[in-house]
Amino acid sequence: MKTTAFLFACVMTSLPVTAAEASEPSSGALQTLNQQAQALDRLHTVVVAYDGNIIHEHHQGGPGVAAPANVKSLSKTVLAAVTGAAIEAGVIESVEQPMVALLDSVPSAADPQVNDITVAHLLAQQAGLERTSGSNYGAWVASAHWVNDALTRPFVDRPGGRMLYSTGTSHLLSAALTQASGESTLALAQRLLGEPLGIAIPPWPQDPQGIYFGGNDMQLSPRALIAIGELYRNDGMADGQRVLPEGWVEDSWTPRGQSPWTGDGYGFGWFITTLAGEHVAYGRGYGGQALYVIPEREMTVVITSDPTPPSPGGQFQQQLNALVADLLAEE
């Protein structure tokens, strides 16, 4: 187990906040955070950044804070950032662009409603297609063609309707990025996100056609996740360079649907909630992977945990939320 507290300069400039609302967590609050973390056997790391600096790192298992870790479905939040960067770079026109305009082809067996699905619907998990997650996940990843399998599933709601959390929907976004750009999603992520942030984005699994898995199994270090959170906290700017389109963060943190499990809002790859009275945007992944941004407190928090089965269930995510809430509430 290793805990360090220090200043680590990040490259993003700060959004203006009211000074009275933004105070650095005290040493006592961080000590309490460590104690609470140690009580959670699955938890591996906790990293806290304040005002653009990493002020606290705690490691008690698994890969260290600088080592890549499987972030599971937190990959959906990262893929959303890649999509925003692709729009800023002109690879995609806008979130209103139809998905089919970006794909090389659509199977003839697909419902005509697929023509109504936009990039925004993919980002917000509102494609309307039957989910490939949950009980459908095993059959989907065992299929010979993940993209076609997702596209030919029946519609259970209209495009733009209720949130239907589905990794297949995110995978369609990865396919759209690849086929629209002529680059792999990995190459796009490295060029448009990794390079401006100065972070490593290693290869992760691909489908049978070579499309990088959209929305699962990316490998990123906790420090890299902090950099992505800080990019959002600073309105898409990194070291004076615009990486995400102007207004992207506000759009991403505007709820378009609602989680059927927690009731939290969901925007473009981010859940929206309130912890200790503070507005919080967060991404999450199976087993206890989480990235929190608390803009009014100038804070970004990353938590990684054991990603292997069995699942600790929703209760573990509630415990992670409670860790962050207690940190925010501590005077």
Residue ranges and their predicted role:
Residues A5-P16:
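Bacterial N-terminal signal peptides
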Residues N34-G64, L291-Y292, T300-V302:
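A short, well-structured edge-of-sheet supersecondary motif
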Residues G52, A69-V95, L122, L173-L177, ...:
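Active-site SXXK
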Residues N70, A89-A127, T152, A180-L220:
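Active-site helix/loop module of the DD-peptidase/beta-lactamase fold
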Residues G90-S94, S133, T178-Q190, G236-L244, ...:
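Structural helix-adjacent loops and short alpha-helical linkers that scaffold large soluble proteins
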Residues T169-A176, N216-M237, Q289-S305:
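Active-site-proximal alpha-helical segments within enzyme catalytic domains
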Residues I201-P202, V249-V301, P310:
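Active-site Gly/Thr loop motif
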Residues P312-E331:
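Short, gly/Ser/Thr-rich active-site loops of penicillin-recognizing serine hydrolases
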